[in-house]
């Protein structure tokens, strides 16, 4: 049974950068990791409806800078910047240090792996059929310029007695090609039948040196793996 490594971690230093950017003293490393987790958990919960695709944390000797990439920057900023100031005050009180917040707009939200996974999760929680939810997100990603997308859902799909995994694939998603720019996202849907896990891989093209042409490859359409029961 094949296991998938996280495609973002696999490409760190090749075509992806770290989401926590700091160099602490050895004894402070664990504290900073725990603090970063606390910040991300708080912001994802507080700004869920703003469509936050990524949170990048940078630290200097005296300052903490949080870069929030979002599909709806206006919701976070608020009228005349009132909401972002309120958010900053809450973070300063929670962390006990000076915090700077930068808001960046997600140019193509439908081609973001994290937002696509959260979109499917939201639809499943609203009792939309899982196949319909997956196909809708796939169509949106391809219209936004993605070259390929794969979505996997696992759990008691449709209220079935046995948990299973199903996935759809459109276009190309070359997970073994390190120069491929793969965006990955994971989300969980809290349904009445239990938790359903959603994973999304989106292929946005290849990062190549100047003068090098990508090799032509055939596109797959409508790929779908038959359902598989857990434990087989």
Curated annotation (Swiss-Prot):
One GO term describing the cellular component: cytosolic small ribosomal subunit
Molecular function GO terms recorded: mRNA binding; rRNA binding; structural constituent of ribosome
Pfam families associated with the record: KH_2, Ribosomal_S3_C
Region Disordered: start-end pairs: 213-232
Domain KH type-2: residue ranges: 39-107
Record function comment: Binds the lower part of the 30S subunit head. Binds mRNA in the 70S ribosome, positioning it for translation.
Subunit structure as annotated in this protein's UniProt entry: Part of the 30S ribosomal subunit. Forms a tight complex with proteins S10 and S14.
Protein name: Small ribosomal subunit protein uS3
């Amino acid at each position: 049974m094949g296991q998938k490594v996280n495609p973002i971690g696999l490409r760190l230093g090749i075509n992806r950068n770290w989401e926590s950017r700091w160099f602490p003293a050895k004894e402070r490393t664990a504290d900073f990791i725990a603090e970063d987790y606390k910040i991300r958990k708080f912001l994802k919960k507080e700004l869920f409806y703003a469509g936050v695709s990524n949170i990048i944390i940078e630290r200097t000797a005296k300052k903490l800078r949080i870069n929030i990439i979002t599909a709806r920057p206006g919701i976070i900023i608020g009228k005349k910047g009132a909401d972002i100031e309120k958010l900053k005050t809450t973070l300063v009180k929670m962390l006990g240090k000076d915090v700077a917040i930068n808001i960046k707009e997600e140019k193509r939200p439908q081609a973001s792996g994290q937002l696509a996974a959260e979109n499917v999760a939201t639809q499943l929680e609203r009792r939309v059929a899982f196949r319909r939810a997956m196909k809708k997100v796939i169509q949106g990603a391809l219209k936004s310029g993605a070259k390929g997308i794969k979505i996997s859902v696992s759990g008691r799909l449709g209220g079935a007695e046995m948990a299973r995994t199903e996935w759809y694939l459109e276009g190309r998603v070359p997970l073994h090609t390190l120069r491929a720019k793969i965006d990955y996202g994971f989300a969980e849907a809290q349904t009445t039948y239990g938790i359903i896990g959603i994973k999304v891989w989106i292929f946005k093209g290849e990062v190549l040196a100047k003068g090098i042409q990508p090799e032509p490859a055939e596109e797959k359409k409508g790929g779908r793996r038959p359902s598989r029961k857990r434990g087989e």
